[in-house]
Amino acid sequence: MSIAFRESELVSILGQSGCGKTTLLNIIGGLDQYTSGDLIINGQSTKQYKSADWDIYRNHSVGFIFQSYNLIPHQSVLSNVELALTLSGVSKAERRRRAKEALEKVGLGNQLNKRPNQMSGGQMQRVAIARALVNDPDILLADEPTGALDSETSIQIMELVKEIAKDRLVIMVTHNPELAEKYSTRIVKLLDGQIVGDSDPFDPAKEPAHSEVKKTEVTKGQKTSMSFLTALSLSKNNLMTKKGRTFLTSFAGSIGIIGIALILSLSNGVQEYINSVERSTLASFPVSIQHELSLIHI
């Protein structure tokens, strides 16, 4: 297929299950690699992209919204959104500021310290949207963002997505044609991996994009990595929220180790005792060996 997107529009991808909607989304987001053809980003081919280049592209230029939210249950709402910035080398104070702004933008500025299990499905999806926006990506990819929500909450989420699409490209996979017709500026229909309908096709040659600075080029040299201290802090928080299970696991492991040590010690002691009995018994009944020479006359 061949398709191009404008810098700011809300594109809905429609089609039956298995027609390639999610695969298309994953290729655009750099999650899957194409086997033929090319993915051109801001006029630049990605054929020569290495793993580090894809990491930079995913981390700085693309935001992902999934149907299942993918929030970390033991982290607060604010920490979940901040986590998207940990790979960008952003300072803690800056992470906190940007995360708060993103949550306020989606209407959750007064629920920063709640846990995901204390929120409704619509609120968790708003947290996921805030997490996708906190890096200020050029492209927002949404895979069934309203699939697990009721109709009223779906409308609220779509209103939010429509507002976001005013200053960036939003590509959404959905099975809901009614929502797509109402909120999208463009609808693309797929069938067996091919485009069979496009309500507002875009030709870059006839309608060139007007962008002074390309974020992909600006962030080309930036390194994406998580510091050891950050990873240690996340692990510690995970353990602290599961104290009971951690204690029981440690206790059971300790019993197992102690049991193995006792068995080995007992086995070694029994073997040593048997050897000692053998030595003392043989010492009480010495065995003498005599050598006799017999002469045979023929």
Question: Which positions does each model-derived feature cover?
Answer:
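The feature captures the beta-strand-to-loop junction immediately N-terminal to the Walker
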Residues: 14-16
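Conserved ABC ATPase signature
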Residues: 115-125
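Helix-to-loop junction immediately C-terminal to a conserved catalytic motif
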Residues: 29
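Catalytic Walker B motif of ABC-type/P-loop ATPase nucleotide-binding domains
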Residues: 140-143
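Conserved small/polar residues in nucleotide/adenosyl-binding loops
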Residues: 297-298
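Alpha-helical transmembrane segments
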Residues: 245, 258-288
